[in-house]
């Protein structure tokens, strides 16, 4: 009896489990098998939010920014690292020995050629000049006396009162005295020159550096220690290097400039390549290539009237070698790199995007020349590229201006949200009966 009772209990339990499973399957099928193929849970959620239902059927188009490819005349530049050097540099030293008596310049001062820089004690050279002048006077008197004696000897020789030998001897004395006078004149000129050297003047116009010798020191000629260094920075030069592969373009640019009676323009930019410092022209090209680096040296000249370039300053030199006419140009942000190479996303009249492979040319931080794959007038996407797929329709928006107020910026998203909500309500009105039922059940 107990065994039969246990079997009956088990059957009832199994029957209850079976009924529960059947009910669960029925309920699941009831909520999931809706007319539009969506699950019951989804329909329930949509019924609670009609705007959301409409949003799923009318997803907003992804916003992008676009630009139009244009035709421009684009200059071609070659860039190399350069060093500013003075057009002329003079190391001022003394040509005479003596004590430094006075300095007539201020360190860093701009001087002109001929300006007095320093004075060396002139007294020893004044004494030498006086001595030379005295010796000249003495020898000149001897010469005058010898010439008078020679004139007498010549008269006596005609009468036969003196021999020819005496006449020749007197003539030799005259020539010796003439030689002494010339030597004395040379000594005077030398003393005057030494006296002139005691006043050292600027050989060129330029800026003086820091003085290397102080007043009171004894200076010797031929010493390696300079008194001061003068650099000419008006104008100033920039020496820079370019790869040897650029030589043909440089030579062609020089030929074109010569035909037009102009020069090849060169720009000097700062170390970061963000600010142009000065504009000049190509002065010369070295006559040989550096085999170690495979580069060639070039020299450009700049007026440097505002002293923006300083000797030994590092700059980036940009030389303009060509001007590309009718080049197709797009913003740099429009060009992307993929496995197949460079490409851009173009827009048709319906604002649908299409991927185009392109060949790029000259480019900088703002724009890129498209050599092939794109025509002027085509629109390209410049922002929002990461959301694009082939054939996707997008909404072209304009970038917000910098002067937009925070209130304006806040109102725009709110307006867009209201528009989306209206589209959702409109879509919810035409929703399926299952969705409407779900919304009614919640209410």
From Swiss-Prot:
Coiled coil (UniProt feature): none
Domain of life: Bacteria
Keyword Transit peptide among UniProt keywords: no
GO molecular function: efflux transmembrane transporter activity
Region Disordered, residue ranges: 36-57, 398-443
Basic and acidic residues bias (residue ranges): 409-419
Quaternary assembly: Part of a tripartite efflux system composed of MdtA, MdtB and MdtC.
Protein name: Multidrug resistance protein MdtA
Source organism (scientific name): Yersinia enterocolitica serotype O:8 / biotype 1B (strain NCTC 13174 / 8081)
């Amino acid at each position: 009896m107990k065994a039969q009772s246990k079997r009956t209990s088990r059957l009832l339990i199994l029957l209850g489990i079976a009924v529960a499973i059947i009910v669960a399957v029925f309920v699941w099928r009831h909520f999931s098998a809706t007319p539009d193929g969506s699950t019951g849970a989804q329909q329930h959620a949509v019924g609670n939010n009609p705007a959301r239902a409409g949003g799923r059927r009318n997803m907003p188009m992804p916003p992008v920014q676009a630009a139009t490819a244009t035709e421009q005349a684009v200059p071609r530049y070659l860039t190399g690292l350069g060093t500013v050097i003075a057009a002329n540099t003079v190391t001022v030293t003394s040509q005479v020995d003596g004590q430094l008596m006075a300095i007539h310049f201020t360190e860093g001062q701009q001087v002109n050629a001929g300006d007095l820089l320093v004075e060396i004690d002139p007294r020893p050279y004044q004494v030498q000049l006086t001595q030379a002048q005295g010796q000249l006077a003495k020898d000149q008197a001897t010469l005058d006396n010898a010439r008078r004696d020679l004139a007498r000897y010549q008269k006596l020789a005609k009468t036969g009162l003196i021999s020819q030998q005496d006449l020749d001897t007197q003539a030799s004395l005259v020539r010796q005295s003439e030689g002494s006078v010339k030597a004395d004149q040379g000594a005077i000129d030398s003393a005057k020159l030494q006296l002139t050297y005691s006043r050292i003047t600027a050989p060129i116009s330029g800026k003086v550096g820091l003085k290397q010798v102080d007043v009171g020191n004894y200076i010797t000629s031929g010493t390696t220690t300079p008194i001061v260094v003068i650099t000419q920075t008006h104008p100033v030069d920039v020496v820079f290097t370019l790869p040897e592969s650029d030589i043909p373009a440089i030579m062609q640019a020089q030929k074109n400039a010569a035909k037009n009676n102009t020069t090849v323009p060169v720009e000097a930019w700062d170390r970061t390549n963000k600010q142009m410092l000065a504009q000049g022209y190509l002065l010369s090209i070295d006559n040989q290539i550096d085999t170690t680096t495979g580069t060639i040296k070039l020299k450009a000249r700049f007026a440097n009237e505002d002293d923006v370039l300083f000797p030994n300053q590092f700059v980036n030199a940009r030389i303009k070698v060509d001007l590309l006419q009718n080049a197709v140009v797009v913003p740099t942000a429009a060009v992307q790199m993929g496995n197949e190479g460079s490409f851009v996303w173009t827009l048709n009249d319906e604002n649908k995007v299409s991927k185009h492979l392109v060949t790029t040319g000259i480019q900088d931080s703002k724009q890129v020349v498209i050599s092939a794959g794109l025509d002027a007038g085509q629109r390209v996407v410049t922002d929002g590229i990461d959301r694009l797929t082939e054939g996707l329709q997008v909404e072209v928006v304009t970038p917000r201006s910098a002067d937009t107020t925070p209130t304006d910026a806040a109102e725009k998203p709110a307006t867009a949200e209201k528009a989306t909500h209206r589209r959702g309500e409109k879509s919810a009105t035409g929703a399926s009966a299952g969705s409407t039922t779900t919304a009614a059940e919640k209410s």
